[in-house]
Structure formats: C-alpha cells, structure tokens
Regions:
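Active-site helix of classical SDR
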Residues: 126, 161, 169
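Alpha-helical segment proximal to the catalytic Tyr-Lys
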Residues: 131, 174-178, 237
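Substrate-binding pocket helix/loop in short-chain dehydrogenase/reductase
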Residues: 101-103, 107-115, 141, 209
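Short C-terminal tail/terminal secondary-structure segment
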Residues: 2-10, 97-100, 240-261
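Residue(s) in the substrate-gating loop at a strand-loop-helix junction
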Residues: 146
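Conserved glycine-rich Rossmann-like NAD(P)H-binding loop of the short-chain dehydrogenase/reductase
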Residues: 39-55
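C-terminal substrate-recognition "lid" of short-chain dehydrogenase/reductases
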Residues: 123, 217-246, 251
Length: 261
C-alpha cells in the first residue's frame, strides 16, 4: 500500500538523520555539510585537517580522521556511534590528486597514496558505518567521483581512482541494497573551489572553459551540495547504483565543441 504523500525534498527533509561527510574542511565538502545541515541533519564533519565551521551545540561534530588509516576510521565511527547511535548518510568526498603527468612519469609511491585516500578511504568509511546502517535497516552512501572517470585527463591516477570508485559504488548498491542501504555516486565537472582557483586566474583560460560548458558558467560547490542533498533524501529513495553527473552539460557537449566554429 502506498504511504501518505509527504514532500520529500524540503527544508526539514533530513530532520533527525545523521550524516558523515569526509573531506569536509573546505570547498565541495564544506558545501555538502552546509546543505545537509540546512535540511535538518546532524552532520559529522570529517577531515584530516581541522574543520572551520560548526560545533556540537548546533548539531555538527568535527572529527579529525585520516580516511586511509583503518584505525583512524574506526575511531571516527566509534565517535559517531557514541554521540548519535546511528548513521543515515555517508558522503565519501575526501580525495587527493597530483600534478598533471603521464603514468610513465608518476612515482609509484604517489600512485599508491592517491589510491589509499580516494578508493581505500571510501571503502574503509563505508565498512565502518555499515553496521549502523544495517542495524537501522537503511542508509544512503554517496561517493564523490568525477567526470575524469569517463573523460581521461593527464591526472591519470586521480581519474583511475574515480572510475574504480564508481565500480565500488555499484557493488555496494547490489550487495547492500537488500538491507535498505542505497549507494550512488556523483561526478562533478569543473567546480570553482579554493583548490581549483589557480586554473581560473587566467582570463583567457577561464573564458575558454566557460564557452565549452552549455550552462555557460563554472560550477559552484553549492551545485554539488544540492545534488548530494537530493541523493541523501527520500526524494531519491528508488535511486540506487547510479552516477549523477553535475557538470553543466560539459561531457555531453564534447562533439559539439569539436565542430564549433
């Protein structure tokens, strides 16, 4: 029988829920935290560095954690369990990259580090909160991937980890879906953040990039925050194992840009 209609995507859509967000100290991660908190969720802001905003008094808990270290992740999960006793939303956003070089020149140590944080970290965090989601018979895992998973750049190790993260997402969706746990990924396009700002300081490069995007603008962290909020809410309750591309139409316009005059 259908349940009574309730608007699933409102300002209090996440009231009473607990969200864990990694890579929360700035940029996209911080915007995700702001969106989830604004919709009523208690937010655990996880980063290897100190998070600049929020306190336990306003429903936000800051936790220092190295997502590539299993002991550090388990300690983070213990804090979530002790403070809230549940976890409804996990956003695996923590990631690192490297300077654009070909794989033939990329040191193996750097390759391994990128994989440890971007891929191993997502798995460790998901495994750590899984018992809470399993016991409460539900949860939403959102892995932040990238359009570089489908459109290779010279950030070879980064794009490879993001493609693998999408595969991991689908595996989680299939294995954990029967337990009420959804898993989806988000692939941001060009987003202007403090870390990416150097790419946009050259006016010529900036205008060229804007012209390649049908939306005719560079994305903002809030664009990703809104997409995560959708996947975290009941508005997406039947969405599982999918990748949501948030790029203003950039990837779809590749052939159009090729033949543009």
């Amino acid at each position: 029988m259908d349940t009574p209609f309730k608007l699933p995507f409102s300002s209090d859509a996440l009231q009473g829920r607990v969200a864990v967000v990694t890579g929360a100290a700035g940029g996209i991660g911080l915007a995700i935290c702001e969106h989830l908190h604004a919709m009523g969720a208690a937010v655990v802001q996880v980063d290897v560095n100190a998070c600049p905003a929020g306190s336990d008094a306003d429903g936000r808990l800051n936790v220092r954690c190295d997502v590539s270290d299993s002991a550090s992740v388990e300690e983070m999960a213990n804090q979530v369990r002790t403070r809230f006793g549940r976890c409804d939303i996990l956003v695996n956003n923590a990631a690192v990259s490297a300077a654009p070089v070909g794989r033939e020149a990329l040191p193996l140590e750097l390759w391994d580090r990128i994989f440890r944080i971007n891929l191993r970290g997502a798995l460790l965090c998901a495994q750590a909160v899984f018992p809470l989601m399993r016991d409460q018979q539900g949860g939403s895992i959102i892995n932040v991937s990238s359009i570089s998973a489908q459109t290779p750049t010279r950030l070879g190790a980064y794009g490879t980890t993001k493609a693998a993260l999408q595969a991991l997402t689908r595996q989680m969706a299939v294995e954990w879906g029967p337990l009420g746990i959804r898993a989806n990924s988000i692939s941001p396009g060009m987003i202007r953040t403090p870390l990416s700002e150097p790419h946009y300081r050259n006016e010529g490069v900036l205008h060229k990039r804007i012209a390649s995007i049908p939306a005719r603008r560079i994305g903002r962290p809030a664009d990703i925050g809104g997409a995560v909020a959708f996947l975290a809410s009941d508005a997406s309750s039947y969405v599982n194992g999918q990748d949501l591309v948030v790029d203003g139409g950039f990837v779809k316009a590749s052939l159009t840009n090729l033949y543009a005059t």
